[in-house]
A protein has these predicted regions:
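Glycine-rich, mobile lid/loop segments that gate access to catalytic sites or pores
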Residues: 3-99, 106, 111-119, 124
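Terminal-appendage/accessory-domain detector
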Residues: 85-95, 102-360
Length: 360
């Protein structure tokens, strides 16, 4: 791996992204009703990329994708709990896809009609056996990776447009958290269905709470890693402000989804003013991309706690300007370890209750 040039991995990444996105087109939008596309179609991308890195020919790569079809998984129910399984979906997709490719490279075969067959992936996870004509349109002429989104906030993407609207209104009108009487966020279907959580009790729930994230943006200035640390989750200013944030379904925005992921935000200020914004795109989307500096800032924020700041800077420089991959990195933590999940033994035993636990 240390001698691997940059062209082959780049080709593998582009191909993996292309395969997963086109399979996603074939099964959407009905697939998203029960399935999380990152965990499902992401598996096909990982299988394709790994197969190409391993030097598989077209037949072996096809078997990698076929085997990935039976490995793919990731349920929408994971979004609707305080559990940690949802963030595991991308890791599982990468692991399962890589395993499928390693097996294919060694001669393991899959059902080559696993995607489109009558009881295959599309039939099992969407409303039909797949919109393959639509999925294959423009193949080789346009590439999905050129229209990718970089996440600019550390929470659910269905909240992004609302957060961008609040940030723009704050910059334009100069108000702070203490000036806000109420916030109303109108969104499309998943914004309401997945992210209308007025009383989140855990880090995972907070990442899917539009109310919490809007309040955290106003109080902390951003919604990145620090917004989900224990101190932020217990911050009385965020708690109080989040109770004044309402979320509703906007029919116009719902009709435009998934082609457009927008938000309409109205902020009522204590001085009597009401300011509003229709946020038609999200920062980080193809039509509003992050700058190179913003991407570097995000990379460093995520990488430095794992490999250390000097190594993160060197790695970024190598990825930007080098003609070969930097090789395997020792993932030695340079920062204090993240808190462990509370031990079950430390909790007093309580009778089961049908009520959800209180948030704070």
């Amino acid at each position: 791996w240390n001698a691997l040039g940059s062209a082959r991995p780049a080709r593998a990444i582009v191909a993996g992204y292309e395969v997963s996105c086109r399979i996603g087109v074939a099964v959407q939008p009905s697939h998203y009703r029960y399935w999380h596309t990152t965990g499902t179609v992401g598996t096909f991308g990982a299988a394709t990329a790994t197969a190409l890195l391993l030097g598989c020919d077209a037949e072996r790569t096809a078997h990698a994708v076929a085997t990935a079809a039976t490995f793919a998984g990731g349920l929408q129910q994971a979004f609707r709990s305080s559990g940690m399984s949802k963030p595991l979906h991308p890791g599982h997709a990468a692991d399962a896809g890589a395993l499928a490719a390693i097996g294919a490279a060694a001669g393991v075969t899959g059902a080559l009609d696993a995607l489109h067959g009558p009881v295959g992936f599309a039939a099992a996870t969407s409303e039909d056996t797949g919109k393959w004509d639509k999925a294959l349109a423009g193949l080789g002429e346009r590439f999905a990776i050129t229209a990718m989104t970089f996440k600019n906030h550390g929470c659910c993407g269905h909240i992004f447009a609302g957060l961008d609207a609040v940030a723009a209104l704050r910059a334009e009108h100069g108000f702070g958290p203490d000036d806000v009487e109420a916030v109303h966020l109108g969104g499309y279907g998943p914004t309401k269905e997945v992210c209308d959580r007025p009383d989140p009790g855990t880090e995972q729930e907070a990442r899917f709470s539009a109310q919490y994230c809007v309040a955290a943006l106003l109080v902390l200035g951003g919604v990145r890693l620090a917004a989900f640390e224990p101190a932020a989750l217990a911050d009385p200013r965020i708690r109080a402000l989040s109770r004044r944030v309402a979320v509703s379904l906007d029919p116009e925005l719902a009709a435009d989804y998934p082609g457009r992921r927008a938000a309409k935000v109205a902020v009522k200020l204590r001085d009597g003013r009401e300011v509003s914004r229709h946020q038609r795109t999200r920062k980080g989307d193809p039509d509003a991309p992050l700058s190179d500096g913003e991407l570097a800032e995000k990379f460093t924020e995520l990488a430095a706690p794992v490999v250390g700041a000097p190594a993160a800077r060197a790695l970024l420089d190598s990825l930007r300007h080098g003609d070969a991959l930097p090789g395997l990195l020792p993932l030695t933590a340079r920062a204090p370890p993240r808190r462990a999940a509370p031990s079950r033994k430390a909790r007093p035993r309580r009778r089961p209750s049908r009520r959800a636990p209180t948030a704070w």
